[in-house]
């Protein structure tokens, strides 16, 4: 397999071309300051980037758009972006047609924040022709955890649908800067549109709270999460965890079974070989408990951004999560 590198980016953000505060150039400057390698600007039913990807210094800027209607939001990524006439879709058939057109143009499709109380997906989506699903939108909150649970059921049932995260950034709120929160890291052959989108579709990725937050990599020989490996009795998969935070919990799953669990202490890194007992998949995640100041700050954010969800019981949140490594 060709050499691959880890590259970080944000799949979901808005500029002043639709309802964001900053111009595309200003948004790009903010992303460069975050240390991102690639971004996809996804204005509502508009293309703010142009026909092709380009580089602003070392930052890859990929064309995108959020196909937006009252029944659901869907991101489309890539240089073959369809033209939009400004009409907001109303019917399921319009989403199906747009997904088909996007795919025929070589684009990548992702369903956005499907369980969001304000802008959720209100149509059938178990069999919708999408490459990815945005399981983590904005800061981690209740509807994201619901989506993660849904996604877990999908992959347990054998559906290979890649998970990704997007900040859905529009502007700063006081001192709260949510750009690149979360951040999606992809394992790609190069920092090009073709290789970034291919890695997103395959699930060669993990999602984490920010560019500087924890990192999780599952590997077997030259394969990582998103790749397919052959089951061998007695086999072990390597887990490499970096930038760990105290009092969080790291778990590795072989299908629904927890095969490794560790309460993080003072260590900042961890390297473990973990035995795999059955075919299916392996994935890893880090979770934390909402307590004290963190809980109070979370409640304030929910009251502002997701008031319909603020009273839903919630005390465990995902901090970092991988896509599955498929074991066949």
Give the location of each predicted region.
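A metal-dependent hydrolase metal-coordination microenvironment
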Residues: 1-112, 117-129, 134-153, 157, ...
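C-terminal functional module detector
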Residues: 1-6, 172-328
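Extended two-metal-dependent nuclease catalytic cores across DNA- and RNA-processing enzymes
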Residues: 158-160, 205-206
